[in-house]
């Protein structure tokens, strides 16, 4: 409206036009769609930073195989190693190693199409799977934008990948030292789009950020962004609990 506040949101639901009016608006569509909604609406972007600093973590899936024993686990995602999170031994941070859900032979075949299931089944039965996660750093060139039809486009290149390579090497060393003679890797690229964050960065300076430290838009005092878009950096952990904790924090600050 004339005062700069958001008066209503319009869209479609089940093919029908929809309009919602309100006193306060909270946006939590995920970092990509939050940026797209703001860009399509032409709001909250006096800084020109909406959509920039897109981050998705540097991730690699590892399958480690020990031919001497089978892995009969049901719920494998039960452990996380943070020994290298703050320091990789060189004074600089690394990341986290975490168990992930048990991989089956049919899942392996999607990445090894020519391999017969008769070979993959004993491999899957003797494998243990880990996720190696390190921080990707915010780069203004990594961004969400819209094409001429208003569709989302992603511009992205890896950042801070040397730290990822170091943690991968450490993971291989540890696993082989524990008797896992074969270690296979699947490096995630942008198609995985994991843990997206950072497209509506928080900060105190309206010229250098989209929302303030309470996740309120610098441009519209009744608009809050409460998903991972506000992240100034990505860290090297799953972001869901941080998103939830911050949303609860912001909810307590919103005027009743």
Regions found by a protein language model. Give the residues of each.
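Glycine-rich loop(s) and the adjacent beta-strand/alpha-helix scaffold that form part
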Residues: 1, 9-75, 227, 246, ...
């Amino acid at each position: 409206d004339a005062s700069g506040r958001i008066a209503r949101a319009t869209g479609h639901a089940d093919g029908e036009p929809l309009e919602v009016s309100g006193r306060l608006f909270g946006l939590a569509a995920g970092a990509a769609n939050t940026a797209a909604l703001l860009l399509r609406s032409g709001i909250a972007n006096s800084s020109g930073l909406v959509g920039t600093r897109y981050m998705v973590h540097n991730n690699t899936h590892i399958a480690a195989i020990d031919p001497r024993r089978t892995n009969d686990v049901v719920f494998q995602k039960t452990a996380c190693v943070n020994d290298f999170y703050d320091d990789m031994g060189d004074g600089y941070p690394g990341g986290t190693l975490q168990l992930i859900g048990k991989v089956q032979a049919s899942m392996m075949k999607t990445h090894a199409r020519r391999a017969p299931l008769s070979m993959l089944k004993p491999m899957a039965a003797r494998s243990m799977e880990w996720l190696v996660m390190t921080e990707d750093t915010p780069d203004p060139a990594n961004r969400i934008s819209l094409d001429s039809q208003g569709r989302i486009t992603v511009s992205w290149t890896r950042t801070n990948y040397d730290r990822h390579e170091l943690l991968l090497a450490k993971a291989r060393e540890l696993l082989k030292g524990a008797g896992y003679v074969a270690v296979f890797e699947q490096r995630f690229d942008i198609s995985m789009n994991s843990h997206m964050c950072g497209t509506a960065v928080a900060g105190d300076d309206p010229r250098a950020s989209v929302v303030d430290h309470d996740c309120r838009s610098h441009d519209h005092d009744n608009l809050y962004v409460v998903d991972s878009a506000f992240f100034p950096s990505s860290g090297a952990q799953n972001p869901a609990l941080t998103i939830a904790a911050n949303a609860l924090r912001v909810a307590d600050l919103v005027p009743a």
